[in-house]
C-alpha cells in the first residue's frame, strides 16, 4: 500500500510531493519549482532521518535560485538522505563544498535568516534577506548587489559576518532578484538610491544604536556611493567592491548609449558574461542555472543612468569624508580597477583603504580567493569600530 501527498509552500512556487510505501519503509520527497534558502529551511523541518525509514529526495524538476539551497542538500545527504535525479552541476558543487567544509566548517545558512520586503515610495515590493548572530550584533552590514546578482548570492558572505558578530542584510534592487519592477530596468538611478535609503532606514529602526556599514558591489557600489554622498552621517563606513565607476568601453560608445536611451530606453543591449565574474567553475555554473539572472540583459536606460551617475560621482568624491574601503580585482573585465584607484585618490576621507587583488575577477566575494577578501573586509570593519 502506498499514498502520496501534494502540497505547496504558502506564497511560493515550490511543490513537494511526499510518497510513502508502507511495505518498503521508504519516504520520497519529490520536489518541483524554484528552490532558495528559505524554502530549503522549511523543507528541512519536513525531512526526518529514521533508522526504520529511508528518505529519498527527487530533484528532477528543481531549479536552484541560490547556493544556500544547494548547501542544504549537502547537509541532508551527509545525514543519510539519498539524492536522486540530482543535476550534475549541483552534484559537482556539493562535492566541492563538502571538501571545503572539511577544512572550514561553516554554520547552517538557514539559521537566523529571514526574507522580508518593504514598499518603495512608488508602490513596489522590495525584497531583502537578513542574517543575525546570537545576541546583540557589533554592527550591521547592508549589502547592495550589482548586475547579474541578487541577495541570494550573499549567503556565504553573511555567514562570515555573523561568525564575526555582525548582522547582515542584502537587498534585491527593483527589477532584480525577487523585487517588483520591470526586469533589469530603472527609469532613474535615483530610484535605486531611494530604495536603498528606505532599506538603510529600516535597518536602523530595527537595530537602533548599531553602527551600519554599506557594502556595494559593482553597480551596487555606484548606488551605494550616491547614497553615501547625501547620508554620510548615517553610516559608520562605506565598502565599494569592484566599483563600476569606469567601464571597459570607449567614451564615444558611452555617448551613443546615452543618446540611445532617449530613443529606445527599454531596449536590452548588453549581456554580461557570467564567466567574467568568477574563476570558480561551480560559481559560474550556479549563475548560469539561476532563473533570476539566466536571461539577464541590461536595457539602454539602465546603463545610461549608471554612466550619468558615474559622471556625477566624479565631482562628488572630494566631499566623501566617512571611512572607505575600496576593493578591486586586477583581472576584472566588467569594470576597471583604475576607477577604484581614482576614487581612492580623490576621495576626501582621511580614513580610506584601497586593496587590489592580483588576478581576481569581477565578483570578489564569489571568486577563487574570496576567503582573503572576506577577511580583509571584516578586519577593516573591526578596525574602524576600534578607532571610533
Regions found by a protein language model. Name each.
Residues 217-298:
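Alpha/beta-hydrolase-fold enzymes
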Residues 106-135:
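N-terminal cap/lid segment of alpha/beta-hydrolase-fold proteins
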Residues 320, 326-328, 332:
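Short beta-strand/loop motif that positions the catalytic acidic residue
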Amino acid at each position: 500500500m502506498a499514498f502520496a501527498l501534494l502540497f505547496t509552500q504558502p506564497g511560493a512556487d515550490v511543490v513537494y510531493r511526499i510518497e510513502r510505501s508502507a511495505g518498503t519503509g521508504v519516504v520520497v520527497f519529490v520536489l518541483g519549482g524554484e528552490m532558495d534558502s528559505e524554502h530549503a529551511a522549511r523543507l528541512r523541518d519536513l525531512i526526518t532521518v529514521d533508522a526504520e525509514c529511508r528518505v529519498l529526495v527527487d530533484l528532477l524538476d528543481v531549479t536552484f535560485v541560490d547556493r544556500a539551497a544547494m548547501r542544504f542538500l549537502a547537509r541532508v545527504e551527509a545525514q543519510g538522505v539519498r539524492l536522486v535525479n540530482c543535476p550534475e552541476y549541483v552534484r559537482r558543487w556539493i562535492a566541492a563544498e563538502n571538501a571545503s567544509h572539511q577544512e572550514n566548517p561553516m554554520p547552517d545558512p538557514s539559521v537566523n535568516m529571514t526574507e522580508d520586503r518593504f514598499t518603495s515610495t512608488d508602490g513596489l515590493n522590495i525584497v531583502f534577506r537578513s542574517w543575525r548572530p546570537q545576541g546583540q550584533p557589533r554592527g550591521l552590514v547592508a549589502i547592495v548587489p550589482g548586475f547579474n546578482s541578487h541577495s541570494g548570492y550573499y549567503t556565504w558572505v553573511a555567514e562570515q559576518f555573523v561568525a564575526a558578530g555582525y548582522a547582515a542584510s542584502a537587498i534585491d534592487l527593483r527589477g532584480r532578484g525577487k523585487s517588483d519592477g520591470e526586469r533589469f530596468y530603472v527609469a532613474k538611478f535615483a530610484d535605486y538610491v531611494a530604495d536603498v535609503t528606505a532599506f538603510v532606514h529600516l535597518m536602523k529602526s530595527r537595530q537602533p544604536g548599531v553602527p551600519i556599514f554599506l557594502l556595494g558591489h559593482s553597480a551596487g557600489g555606484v548606488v551605494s556611493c550616491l547614497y553615501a554622498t547625501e547620508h554620510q552621517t548615517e553610516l559608520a563606513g562605506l565598502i565599494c567592491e569592484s566599483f563600476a565607476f569606469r567601464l571597459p568601453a570607449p567614451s564615444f560608445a558611452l555617448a551613443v548609449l546615452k543618446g540611445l536611451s532617449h530613443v529606445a530606453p527599454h531596449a536590452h543591449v548588453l549581456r554580461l558574461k557570467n564567466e567574467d565574474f568568477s574563476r570558480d567553475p561551480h560559481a559560474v555554473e550556479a549563475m548560469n542555472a539561476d532563473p533570476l539572472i539566466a536571461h539577464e540583459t541590461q536595457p539602454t536606460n539602465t546603463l545610461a543612468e549608471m554612466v550619468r551617475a558615474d559622471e556625477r560621482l566624479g565631482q562628488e568624491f572630494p566631499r566623501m569624508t566617512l571611512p572607505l574601503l575600496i576593493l578591486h580585482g586586477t583581472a576584472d573585465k566588467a569594470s576597471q580597477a583604475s576607477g577604484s584607484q581614482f576614487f581612492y585618490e580623490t576621495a576626501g576621507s582621511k580614513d580610506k583603504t584601497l586593496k587590489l587583488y592580483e588576478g581576481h575577477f569581477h565578483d570578489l566575494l564569489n571568486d577563487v580567493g574570496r576567503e582573503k577578501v572576506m577577511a580583509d573586509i571584516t578586519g577593516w570593519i573591526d578596525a574602524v569600530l576600534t578607532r571610533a
